[in-house]
Amino acid sequence: RLGYMIKCKGINPENILTVTYTKAATGDMGERFYSFFAGSIPMPVFRTINSLCVSVIKLYERLKGTTAFDLVTDDKITGLIIREGYKKHMKDFPTEGDIKDIHTAISYVKNMMLKEDSFTDDDIGVKGFKKIYKYYNDKLREKRLMDYDDQMVYAHTILVKYPRILKFFSDKFKYICVDEAQDTSKIQHRIIKLLTAQNGNIFMVGDEDQSIYGFRAAYPEALVNFEKEYKNAKVLLMEKNYRSSQEIVKVADGVIQKNKDRHPKNMQAVSKNKGRVNFIKTAGSAAQYMELLKTAKNHKGETAVLFRNNESAIPLINLLEKEKIPFSYRQTDGAFFSNRVVTDILNVIKFAQNPSDTELFMQIYYKINSILKLSRAAAEGACDEASATGRTIPQVLCANPLYRRGKDTAIFANVIKNVNTRKPGQFIAEVYNTLGYGEYMENMHYPAQKINILISVATQEKTMRDFLLRMIALEDIVRNRQYNGTDFILSTVHSSKGLEYETVYLMDIQDGILPSVNMFDDPKLYEEERRLFYVAMTRAKKELNIFDLNQSGRASFTLEAAGVLTGKGETVTKNIPKVYDRINHRQFGAGTVIAADGDFITVSFDGGRTRKFSFKVLREKGLLLMNKSAKNGQ
């Protein structure tokens, strides 16, 4: 299209701006343009949105005779500011995962153009975020620094406030083309819209069905509403899939069509290859890992194992390393090993091995407090007494009536005492169940996946010492593993976007993982999870294998994909409860339907909770009992 604009329409290439998502993409597009036209026509301008924003800020500097803040290019600097803000406001030390989550949340807020008074910590999903966010921005301004997101915020402000600067860029770039538009954020779309307002020449290429970066503030609504946003706009649908075989395209298309916020499309495979979609039934995660281990040993040709979260790969990596089977791992992330849940469990193990360690006890006592029931003062008193008398802390707790809580204290002491007689996986399960750490996790809304992964690794080791050493070795493997080009590849779905593989295995397709926790509470987020599943399926060229763990009923997305193949995958509308109907949920008890929207119902439970569910999933998992209408006292 760029070549046509320049060669056939006589448009000056200097007046064409093509915006791509990353710096690498600008280079790639420039090379592809040159390979097409071999220098026969001049090169148009390829830029990232941040590069464009730098130009806006520099022009502002020249016109106003001022100097902009310095750009922070090192994440360690912004990470240090976040760390200090966290310590100040949370009175605790952040983990690697905490800093990463806050970094992502800061970028999200700026890209979504959210004002500080328009959101809460719960909206963002990060405890203490608003105070840390303010601290972070104040420190940047104090040091006359800006981050990459600030570049866009400042450039947008300049373009809005100074028509002269906006006109300069509108005159310069009369034609704007945007690649990968589904990954573009709200503020980026606003900047692009400002620049195109004068000339009205905008061309976007994107697929809202592949918008999977909502946590980075990707804004697929701009594509869905393209005709409303831009006068005289036209949408052309690309409905041919050039990668995947027929059955894969059929299943993937059948799943994604359940999303509402999209342009209606009917994808067709160009390939004449029928291909295969298989559902591999296993009894649970451990059986899934063993199946993948067999696959790694016997696979032929390029094979990828895809998963939602980096940590899903850890038990599999553990097995592959033990068996010395070569594999590649794309974009490794070792945040699992510094996660609070993992650190807590390891601290309990270390305390059990040295039950006189007062520092460790003070770090863990309140996390197993459903059994200990100690105030901070009591915990400190027990530590002081242990130090003074030379006894262990469990001995002090059992002997002193000030700290003893009936049988519970003895249970705690017994679990700690038996650390080296229990198998590692068994001991972790006892910490979770018997010592009440699971209750603490539930109160903190921590997902159970990390405990399950720890137990998966622990069950491969004979002694606690072996387990602790293995965790150290695994962390080194995960953090330092390089992509080495072998044809058995492990990757998150996000890292696999834009790539393709002959054969794909999708692991951990479970409610709570993919789709992730609490997605039924928000249909919009649930649709993004479905898009992620769609992207995962369409990485496969010839064969797609989806694990069906069958632990507590089939996963929502497994049901949808299997339903497309069997012809029984239509959304269930029959017998959907109406407003005022009474229902009985096997977990939450009795409640009243207060809203119904398509497949989704919102229920106010008698216990005080209000939750949103997919009726189809409730029915298929046997979680729902229907009662009579509550209206008019019936």
Across the structure, where does each feature detected by a protein language model lie?
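P-loop NTPase Walker
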Residues: R1-T67, K167, K250-D253, D597
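Helicase P-loop NTPase motor core
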Residues: L2, K231-K234, E239-P326, Q353, ...
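Conserved helicase NTPase motor core
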Residues: L17-T18, A25, V45, I77, ...
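ATP-hydrolysis module of ASCE/P-loop NTPase motor domains
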Residues: M43-P44, R62-D150, I371-K373
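Conserved helicase core region in the C-terminal RecA-like lobe
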Residues: V45-S55, C177-E180, V205, N309, ...
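ATPase/helicase motor core of nucleic-acid motors
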Residues: K274, K297-R422, G438
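Accessory C-terminal helicase-associated subdomains
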Residues: E359, V396-S495, S516, K541-F547
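C-terminal accessory regions
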Residues: I509-F615, E620-Q634
